[in-house]
Amino acid sequence: LNRAATTSRAPRGARFNFRAIGERLRAYRLAAELRSEDVAEQLDISRAAIYKLERGEIVKIDTLERLAALLGVSLANLLGVEVEYHDSAVSYFERMRQLESRSERIVAHFDPISFLLTSEDYDVWLRHMLDESIPPTLADRHWANTIDRVLGILQERKSSFSRQRLAVTSLIGLRQIEQFLHHGLVGRLGLPPGVQLERKMAARREVARIVEFLEADTTGVQIGIVSDNMPNETFQIFEAQGEAYVAVSPFRLGELPNLRTGIATITTSPDGVGMYRAMIDRLWADSAKGKEGAALLGQLLARF
């Protein structure tokens, strides 16, 4: 393909997407560790009404107003006129899972590689990296619970991807892969030499897996290796019939991960989606694909 799999036309997100509102409520509830009855009490409605809300069956406008206040956003934002903001990794990755579950195609850049393309072993290493990523004084029960919940959502995403095999286009930065191989799968610097060696070998296996994808020309998976500068934040476009979302995130699942600090955004703005499409198409056009991309990564592996 000469262009990334972003479709020739630009789907427009629904102006008032009630299903998305319900999904945001569920993501908020999970992030806040609230039961449905807790939210029902705060909104002064029945638990049955909460289930209807989460299914996208909106009831009354005053309920929407109370829901907007609960989520800490304006009513316009809740109705999808503006942008979703997520200061919680739990709510953000839950929204990603929801959007992926009904997408036909996703186009993404993650640093260093998309979690959906990693091995099953990576899930185990990611837990180690997250445990290492913060000082012991901050490693309380709440942080441990956050790790468990994020990893649970990520595993659901990966399982769903393996079942439905939606079309994926992944942009991978060559410089980011070089840094990935240099550090290995570590949550912080300064680990013992033996541990560092083990983590570097694990990183090599993940990169070798990407090489296999490139050489095999796997159906439904397009990968472009980009030598140009890549954005510092990760992004992903979710596409389905008649709608497109773009998500931008500071949360990081590679070496030196970050789940604690940052604000992610999700929007259906035609301007925002269009700008990201244009950037993706430019990066994709200049990227190395197939055996050419595999050779570039092979050269890096030979150096490490």
Protein language model features and the residues they cover:
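Basic, Lys/Arg-rich alpha-helical nucleic-acid-recognition elements, primarily the DNA-binding modules
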Residues: 1-93
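Generic preference for well-ordered secondary structure
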Residues: 9, 23, 34, 51, ...
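Solvent-exposed, non-transmembrane amphipathic alpha-helical segments
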Residues: 45, 59, 70-73, 87, ...
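Short alpha-helical interface elements
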Residues: 50-54, 64, 68, 75-78, ...
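Charged, helix-prone or intrinsically disordered regulatory segments positioned adjacent to compact structured domains
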Residues: 73-76, 80-134
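Hydrophobic protein-protein interaction segments
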Residues: 109-304
